[in-house]
Amino acid sequence: MGTTPSGTHIRKGDTVRLSWRSNCGVYGTWKKDEKVLAHGGRVSISHKDFKHFSLEVKDARQEDEGNYTLELSNRKARVSGSAAVTLLEFDTEWRGLFLAETDEVKKTLEAFKVSNSEVRCLRFLLQGPVGVGKSSIINTINSVFQGQMVNLTPTDAATGKSHTIAYQAYPIEDAQKKSLPFVFNDIMGLENEKESGALIADIISALKGRVKDGYKFNASSALTETDFHYNSAPSLADKVHCLVTVIHANNIFLFTEEDDAIQKMKQVRKAARDLGVPDVVFMTHVDHCCPLVKKDLNNIYLSKRIKAAMQRCSDLVGVPMNCIFPVKNYHQETKGDAKTECLILHALDKAVKSADDFVRVKSSN
């Protein structure tokens, strides 16, 4: 059985086109989800010479999603073929993009002051598998606030191995190179092998503020109390105030609960939870995940694929849906984009509020 030109995934308002050609005379019956379809209205059925069978459903709607089957029969045999038709988008947004609020959110973050005088900068720790764009998130956020493309942190998605080898804090600066009260710590990627990538013990030490800048990750041994880069008396300012898990929107469908990378992320989340540290997810590469979003980021919260990726992430890692934020990093762009900035700023705003709540509670204890 043939399918629509773009496969079985179509946009709302498109025409569903399915066809079949038989090499002998047969009778045909079209069904959708086991219910017989009849010619009329938006449904057009054509049987030509008892050999060519076609079905068109115009102005596709949510109700047209389903499994379409053509049953063919003659005196000698009975066969059938099926095609699943899926609409790429919902009728309405399932979360607001709030593009008009982007400038206001940016100004609020630029003027932000930490609510605890013991802490000059809120500290965010990025964790996630190799190649998800952790370093690119830091570059993208700095690009937004500086008004130009910034490559503060090295990135390399081609090797399949972590490009980050040392623990380092990266400041966020505005257009005048003034540091904003946010610092991002990047770590070695979590590889999908038990003995590769950053060690859980090192990440937990980082959460506790026990890892100094410059510490080089070692997949075979964790930081010890005798190490030069071990902080034996971390202050609240040294500790992580929000854990940011970074997930590739398309690759999340390739993971299972048993995968080492997923297990590592869950262990780190549990450690953060035990410490009272809040956590969020930044879901990257949304343009690779859905053709609608690749065409226009305005479709981000109409996309069924993006919502499915977020739900899959929630199921695997355990983060609530309202703490998962789809974002797009700058990659090949040379100029800023309002929709890209809207997504990353709203994600950062949520992370900042969560981190500030954490340090405020600590000040009252």
What role is predicted for each listed range?
Residues 41-76:
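Extracellular beta-strand/loop-rich beta-sandwich domains predominantly from IgSF
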Residues 4-10, 43:
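Short beta-strand segments of immunoglobulin-like
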Residues 20, 29-31, 70:
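Core motif of extracellular immunoglobulin-like domains
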Residues 116-118, 141-277, 285-305, 318, ...:
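Switch- and interface-adjacent substructures of P-loop NTPase systems
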Residues 6, 14-18, 122:
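Structural beta-strand segments of beta-rich domains
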Residues 122-146:
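Glycine-rich phosphate-binding P-loop
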Residues 67-90, 148-157:
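Extracellular/luminal immunoglobulin-like beta-sandwich modules
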Residues 88-118:
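N-terminal pre-Walker A segment at the start of P-loop NTPase domains
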